[in-house]
Design a protein with these regions (language model features):
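Bacterial N-terminal signal peptides that target proteins for export
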Residues: 8-28
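CN hydrolase (nitrilase-like) catalytic-core segments centered on the catalytic cysteine
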Residues: 259-278, 345-420
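Cys-nucleophile CN-hydrolase/nitrilase-fold catalytic domain and related Cys-dependent amidase chemistry
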Residues: 216-220, 225-299, 352, 368-373, ...
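Bacterial N-terminal signal peptides
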Residues: 25-37
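Short beta-strand segments enriched in small/hydrophobic residues
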Residues: 197-212
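C-terminal beta-strand edge segments of enzyme domains
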Residues: 150-158, 329, 388-447
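Active-site catalytic loop in hydrolytic enzyme cores
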Residues: 285-357, 372, 376, 380, ...
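Extracellular and organelle-lumenal recognition/adhesion modules and their flexible linkers in secreted
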Residues: 41-198
């Protein structure tokens, strides 16, 4: 049973005479007037039909309607930890919905002194039948990256109402932070157009140059395979790690070059010719330092971004390579992607950081490694992962960690079509991706 009681003074339960009943009526009137003027907490409800509840009275946070903090001129629904590290509760309302309708949920919030907003602040949608019985899995709309200029975050996602559903219970939750406060505003669940499939065609190449005389010879070999991939109209092609070094007599330092530089120019001309994006592993020289770098080339042939490998094996350190210091995501015309390189896949933090930043596909130029790690990174972050390698498998992995298609020595180019708008539902869990960062261990437990 959920606790949905306010913080107002409550009258005695019974009286045995007329005067007592009269006094009770006066007391009730006084309390109601007091609550209306001083606080909206008394019944946990206000004019827009929002209520408040907590799993247990003992863990209920402070909750109130705040007219001093507004969203587009309207009062906000506030929740505060009030010194309780274990505080947990939510505003809620139930609304009628039509089966098969497409509805877009949106709620906005502004938070202060909240340690982990993704974990402590979220919305949940519970589907119900006509009697109010829960149907299927709850939904956890995504918190969009970034904030508005005035500091508001947005929770937003589009849903199709399941066929047997007639009601939706919407919850706006704050939990597990003693010192924080959140204000919710502008919450809506409105009819929308059905989403179009968001199709991306992803290519990976499996090729290891041997007895190559130069970096340029390597590039020519890879360019022939890119041309072969282009026949299948991919949106993006993934190439392997250190592609200008492998098979030559060069070392990390002698194979390094500026980025942008001659290789990005060479690859850019190809990308522009075939109207595709390209991910490629190179060795970058920047002043006195050399990095193991993956570049992203856009359809116009421009350098759209680069990632310097953060997790270096000792062998690369001994060879004079310097580690990078950040994980970045990049927006393309089909979605948001992240880049990792080889040894990064050994450590969960790399892929987890990219997923937390909104990456939908992670590209992995890799010399060689354990395929189980690639599968794990895809599963635990609910992303697609694309590897291009010499000594592991070059493949596209889905959100279950399954190989959708593999490139081999005999068939070095594969192209896979992915719908980034397709929801993956897991037995007993539902949409795991939407739950991951709501239920992830807190940083203070890890550190």
């Amino acid at each position: 049973m959920l606790f949905a009681e306010g913080h107002c003074i409550r009258p005695l339960k019974s009286f045995h005479n007329y005067n007592s009943r009269l006094m009770l009526s006066i007391s009730l009137l006084f309390v109601l007037l007091f609550c209306a003027v001083v606080s909206a907490e008394c019944q946990g409800i206000h004019s827009s039909e929002w209520n408040f509840e907590s799993q247990r009275k003992e863990i209920a946070p402070k909750w109130y309607i705040d007219s001093s903090t507004t969203y587009k001129g309207q009062p906000t629904l506030a929740i505060a930890g009030a010194g309780k590290e274990y505080a947990n509760g939510h505003w809620y309302r139930t609304m009628n919905v039509g089966p098969g309708e497409y509805l877009e949920f949106q709620s906005n919030f502004i938070a202060s002194n909240v340690e982990d907003p993704n974990r402590n602040i979220f919305a949940r949608i519970i589907w119900q039948d006509v009697s109010g019985k829960t149907i299927g899995y709850p939904e956890y709309p995504a918190t969009l990256p970034g904030k508005t200029n005035d500091g508001w975050n947005s929770i937003k996602q589009l849903y199709r109402v399941p066929d047997s559903v007639r009601k939706a219970k919407i919850e706006l939750t704050y939990r597990w932070d003693a010192n924080g406060t959140v204000h919710f505003g502008g919450t809506s669940f409105q009819k929308a157009l059905a989403p179009k499939p968001r199709i991306v065609r992803v290519a990976t190449i499996h090729h290891r140059p041997k007895n190559s005389k130069s970096s340029q010879e390597n590039l020519v070999q890879f360019s022939e395979l890119i041309a072969k991939a282009a026949d299948q109209k991919p949106d993006i092609v993934c190439l392997p790690e250190e592609m200008t070094l492998v098979g030559t007599e060069l070392n990390y330092i002698s194979a390094s070059e500026p980025i942008p530089g001659p290789t990005t120019k060479f690859l850019g001309d190809i990308a522009r010719k075939y109207n595709l994006y390209m991910v490629a592993g190179l060795l970058e020289r920047s002043g006195d330092t050399v990095f193991n770098t993956a570049v992203l080339i856009d359809r116009s042939g421009n350098l759209a971004g680069k990632y310097r490998k953060v997790s270096l094996p000792q062998e690369e350190i001994d060879g004079g390579i310097t580690p990078g210091d950040s994980f970045s995501v990049f927006d393309t015309d089909f979605g948001r992607i992240g880049l990792m390189i080889c040894w990064d896949v050994t450590f969960p933090e790399a892929a987890r950081t990219l997923a937390q930043k909104g990456a939908e596909i992670i590209f992995l130029p890799i010399w060689g490694g354990d395929v189980n790690l690639a599968k794990a990174r895809a599963i635990e972050n609910q992303v697609y992962l694309v590897s291009s390698t010499y000594d592991m498998i070059s493949a596209v992995f889905d959100k279950e960690g399954s190989v959708m298609k593999e490139a081999t020595n005999d068939n070095p180019v594969v192209v896979v079509q992915i719908d980034l708008n397709k929801q993956k539902l897991w037995p007993w869990i539902g949409d795991l991706k939407s739950r991951l960062f709501r239920e992830i261990p807190p940083q203070k437990a890890i550190h």
